[in-house]
A protein has these predicted regions:
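Conserved pre-motif I regulatory segment
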Residues: 1-33, 50, 140
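Conserved nucleic-acid-binding Ia/Ib motif block in the N-terminal RecA-like helicase ATPase lobe
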Residues: 2-3, 7-10, 57-125, 133-136, ...
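Residue-level signature of catalytic and energy-coupling elements of molecular machines
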Residues: 5, 17, 32, 48, ...
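Walker A/P-loop NTP-binding motif
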Residues: 18-30, 41-57, 70-82, 121, ...
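Pre-Walker A (Motif I) flank of P-loop NTPase domains
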Residues: 26-32, 58-62, 110-111, 229-231
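The conserved Walker
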Residues: 34-38
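Post-DEXD/H (motif II) to motif III coupling segment of the RecA-like Helicase ATP-binding lobe
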Residues: 130-139, 143-200
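Conserved interdomain hinge at the start of the Helicase C-terminal
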Residues: 203-234
Length: 234
């Protein structure tokens, strides 16, 4: 595993990797707010690979849920790069392609499955999709899955996998439905918040004018009269 990391040119962990990998290696649940491009994929892949290197092959032990086919394929590529010198096997399960090769991977008990929710549920209707030995569940970009309407699918998937497992939950934002889902899924999680703080767009200047309620209209008209604004949206 270290050889693969070295060949990829990794010399020091990113902040999310430094914060997430230790509790993940300890087997703790994890709730992490981190943006795309922060290195979060390696933050959950490396602990999974470390856990699975010496386990018996033939049983799917890790499931990674992704909102899109493109992200699933990127995660698959990252796992293959990191696991190149290990016996760990991985397959991606997503829509828009035939189910045959995916069925073969599930029948063989590939170690790690990276999947989009809809296609995974299609397979879960069949007896060959067995997840009784699952040890680790990862939700990547959970807020995007919410935006795409996958929350009911995620809840259905949870009914097909063991309740006793490690869950690693990654989301760039934490809207109320996602926060509620974390309370259902996670047990005493390690909490990491590296989400980018909101900032005004480039070229936008923000200002605050403390003013009494009865003077708001007069202040607004005075600001417009100054002529500093070419366009205004109220």
């Amino acid at each position: 595993l270290l050889k693969g990391v070295k060949e990829l040119g990794f010399t020091r962990p990113t902040p999310i990797q430094a914060d997430a990998i230790p509790p993940a290696l300890e087997g703790r649940d994890l709730l992490a707010c981190a943006m795309t491009g922060s290195g979060k994929t390696a933050a959950f892949v490396l602990p999974i690979l470390q856990r699975l290197i010496d386990t018996k092959r033939g049983t799917t032990r890790a499931l990674i849920l992704s909102p899109t086919r493109e992200l699933a394929l990127q995660i698959l590529e990252d796992i293959n790069d990191l696991a190149v010198h290990t016996p760990v096997t991985v397959a991606a399960v997503y829509g828009g392609v035939g189910m045959g090769p995916q069925e073969h991977a599930l029948r063989s008990g590939v170690d790690i499955v990276v999947a989009t929710p809809g296609r995974l549920l299609d397979h879960m209707k069949q007896p060959y999709a067995k997840f009784s030995g699952l040890e680790v569940l990862v939700l990547d970009e959970a807020d995007r899955m919410l935006d795409m309407g996958f929350l009911p699918d995620i809840k259905r998937i949870l009914r097909h996998i063991p309740a006793k497992r490690q869950t690693l939950f990654f989301s760039a934002t934490m809207p109320a439905p996602i926060a509620a889902l974390t309370r259902e899924m996670l047990h005493d999680p390690a909490m990491i918040n590296l989400a980018r703080k909101s900032a005004p767009a480039v070229g936008i200047t923000q200002a605050v004018y403390p003013v009494r309620q009865e003077l708001k209209a007069a202040l607004f008209l005075a600001l417009l009269a100054k002529g500093d604004m070419r366009e205004a949206l109220v």
